[in-house]
Amino acid sequence: MSDPIKVDVRQLPHAEGLPLPSYQSTQAAGLDLIAAIGEQAPLVLAAGRRAMVPTGLVIALPDGYEAQVRPRSGLAARHGVTVLNSPGTVDADYRGEINVLLVNLGSEAFTIRRGERIAQMIVAPVTRVELVRAAALPATPRGSGGFGSTGR
């Protein structure tokens, strides 16, 4: 495994006392993001509702990198709680707080408490492309087959 990429991070006042995001296993791809909501003010996410959950983090990604905010599989499987705009993209030039847009697709209300792991963040290199207008594109066996064209 190569040396880790350094990412500067700042915790906002409402995240004071919370740990920084961390990997939960030696081979984990994502850092777990933590809810930075008030200790005495848990967020109740009713069934079918969505909410923006603050993390209290501001990061400075190196040029040529992005962060993706993705669901935690356990929250989705057990409670139907997932990241609505998955994956959420954090660009290298963004300097605002990272918030997580959660939605409760389950049938019961879900309570989010301060310090709870709510999503995961993956940092990855970005490939930039240059689009070139073309009069025709090369044919492929698949052609224009879209949704469901390769099976169930």
From Swiss-Prot:
Pathway: Pyrimidine metabolism; dUMP biosynthesis; dUMP from dCTP (dUTP route): step 2/2. Substrate binds at R72, S73, G74, N85, T89, V90, D91. Its cofactor is Mg(2+). Its EC number is 3.6.1.23. It catalyses: dUTP + H2O = dUMP + diphosphate + H(+). Keywords: Hydrolase, Magnesium, Metal-binding, Nucleotide metabolism. GO terms for molecular function: dUTP diphosphatase activity; magnesium ion binding. One of its GO terms (biological process) is dUTP catabolic process. InterPro entries: dUTPase (IPR008181), dUTPase-like (IPR029054), dUTPase-like_sf (IPR036157), dUTPase_trimeric (IPR033704). This enzyme is involved in nucleotide metabolism: it produces dUMP, the immediate precursor of thymidine nucleotides and it decreases the intracellular concentration of dUTP so that uracil cannot be incorporated into DNA. This is Deoxyuridine 5'-triphosphate nucleotidohydrolase. It comes from Nitrobacter winogradskyi (strain ATCC 25391 / DSM 10237 / CIP 104748 / NCIMB 11846 / Nb-255). The gene is dut.
